Swiss-Prot record:
Source organism per UniProt: Syncephalastrum racemosum
Propeptide: 20-71
Family the UniProt entry places it in: Belongs to the peptidase A1 family.
Key word Transferase present: no
UniProt-listed Enzyme Commission number(s): 3.4.23.-
Gene: SPSR
Protein name per UniProt: Syncephapepsin
Subunit and interaction comment: Monomer.
Gene3D superfamilies named in the record: Acid Proteases
UniProt-listed SUPFAM superfamilies: Acid proteases (SSF50630)
Keywords, alphabetical: Aspartyl protease, Disulfide bond, Hydrolase, Protease, Signal, Zymogen
S-S pairs: C120-C123, C322-C355
GO annotation terms (biological process): proteolysis
Pfam family, one: Asp
Gene Ontology terms, MF aspect: aspartic-type endopeptidase activity
Amino acid sequence: MKFSLALLATVALATISQAAPVEKQVAGKPFQLVKNPHYQANATRAIFRAEKKYARHTAIPEQGKTIVKSAASGTGSVPMTDVDYDVEYYATVSVGTPAQSIKLDFDTGSSDLWFSSTLCTSCGSKSFDPTKSSTYKKVGKSWQISYGDGSSASGITATDNVELGGLKITGQTIELATRESSSFSSGAIDGILGLGFDTISTVAGTKTPVDNLISQNLISKPIFGVWLGKQSEGGGGEYVFGGYNTDHIDGSLTTVKVDNSQGWYGVTVSGLKVGSKSVASSFDGILDTGTTLLIFDQATGSKVAAAYGAKDNGDGTYTISCDQSKLQPLALTMGGKDFFVPADSLIYVKQGSQCIAGFGYSSMDFAIIGDTFLKNNYVVFNQGVPEVQIAPSKA
């Protein structure tokens, strides 16, 4: 489900504090940052994709760090590549036997593992060739995903081995594209790896990669830690399955309850402040690594924009001052603690003499807490409880 908003959303532009046990990582193979010259910042498209993505499941309108190959310790670390202005983050994942490298956007807002293949005659990227994998098994169920900008993809299901940070999942359900819109061909990624709950999988009854990491005893804890870097600080990012990396945590982790009744990592934001000024009371939000922006409902977005003197562009985006010294931090209160979005992230991109804000609005009645927030705050996602733990992040 995330694919719709997350993967492409990113393409678009697109209670109690608890100290947690230390989870360390081991030095491994470095990954280089990759830039895609075809990408263009487009906040409007990010908003459209987000709306379409979530409408499917609700009735309401590198510099990468290091890889850890340590299955014995029950954790696996996957480095991420940061594309352009933090538009999206992807990892290179191994699929099949022998392994084929697939670039996937990791998305906590969806639950499908989707990518292009040689079965698709219209795909710009034919990343996976099933005829070259000895462990590939065709299942043949149909799937289809569409997006708010009119783009779409569809295909069939199969199973194969998938490796994440040295952790090899056997018999993982994969969705192979047999058709996709032309807009996919210029993207940096080959598909999406959904990290949401299996209740929102496009193909009913499908186990997600996290489900299989748990059931196949590949990770010691049903958690994964997420650090997303900033281009201004060298880019990159990292997912740690089965643990988290304290090297990217600045302070203590705060536990926040999760409502997963709709398949997402839903949280309650109990307050919203610009500087010391309160601009909104309690509202619901979804922690979504696959969405570029911080997207509010329209009423909340209007209040935030007014506090910053931002102009509504009429398409879900705002024009904001390019002078960071005039922008106070935006604080979201969760679990009794404030978590901040600093001035440098309140400006998403400069277009000519104007700047587009890192926040926007949609017609939905909940917020999508995307990368504008997540690249400033480390999150440990716990599928087992469910809950999340959040702390300020550091590069």
